[in-house]
Amino acid sequence: MSTEVVEEFDADYTGRHFLSVEDMSSDDVMRIIERGRQFKAGDAPRVEPGHVAINMFFENSTRTMTSFQMAEHRLGMKILDFDPGHSSVTKGESLYDSVRTVDAIGAEVAVIRHSTNHYYDYLLATGMLGLSVVNGGDGSGQHPSQCMLDLMTIAEEFGHVDGLTVAISGDIVHSRVARSDAQILTRLGANVVFTGPREWMDHDVTRLGTMATLDEVIADVDVAMMLRVQHERFDAGPDFSATDYLHTFGLTDERAERMKPHAIIMHPAPVNRGCEISGHLVEAPSSRIFEQMGNGVMVRMAILEQVLHGRETK
């Protein structure tokens, strides 16, 4: 199928929850991207204001949480405050009971980030929730909204996804971004190459593409997507050196100079400057890292609008 950006948003495309890219067809993905582009161009929301959202982040976040908050604000939603550190979670309350509580008091949409892979399966299997769940990231499983903003950024840059060569580089095994992006990029016809330490590869992800060193592929890529070294998910040990990692696996100045003139640099952030990427390359002319963040608001508006439509039709 064609992966050109869809020109018309199908208002009938709805889903009550937004959980995983595995649930989405290629058309679903491209419709969200196009709706995000319409929001970026100034299109008005197609939902009534006043819906109630709550953002339940059990892992630290700057970009995803504030991006969802801004998206909710622009859609005219009311936002309930939630801080796990000052909630009954500290008293032993389970995720399920926390979500059931906010459901009972009137939240319509819960954006949830949790360290447990597929946490949403248990929540929804009970059949007891009236609210909609939007996955803000589950462990090393999925990060579907990040995938949408990455795809929007690539589509804006090139006008298409099929035929592009995308290097996903770094800590693959701990990265929900790598998993989600690789699944959709390959489905849309991109050539995905994985680079990084061999011990940080994950066959369930790397089987979707090929493996190489960054030096072997950097001159051929259209997109160099660098991943953060996720120190909070493993112990790299006392011998880990950011300088050595950058020299061996990261995007150095020398490697960046070998990229094609039209190639772009991406990173889901937060960035460990001087580790995955030379510090000044974060804001180089070829970098789209901060454009990704801006696009995150737009696609999350599209996701929330879709979920609200889904609540009305299902």
UniProtKB/Swiss-Prot annotation:
Keywords, alphabetical: Pyrimidine biosynthesis, Transferase
InterPro entries, A to Z: Asp/Orn_carbamoyltranf_P-bd (IPR006132), Asp/Orn_carbamoylTrfase (IPR006130), Asp/Orn_carbamoylTrfase_sf (IPR036901), Asp_carbamoyltransf (IPR002082), Asp_carbamoyltransf_Asp/Orn-bd (IPR006131)
Positions of disulphide bridges: none
One annotated Gene Ontology cellular component of this protein: cytosol
Entry GO MF terms: amino acid binding; aspartate carbamoyltransferase activity
UniProt: carbamoyl phosphate binding residues: 63-64, 113, 143, 146, 269-270
Task performed by this protein: Catalyzes the condensation of carbamoyl phosphate and aspartate to form carbamoyl aspartate and inorganic phosphate, the committed step in the de novo pyrimidine nucleotide biosynthesis pathway.
Annotated PANTHER family: ASPARTATE CARBAMOYLTRANSFERASE, ORNITHINE CARBAMOYLTRANSFERASE, MITOCHONDRIAL
Record's protein name: Aspartate carbamoyltransferase catalytic subunit
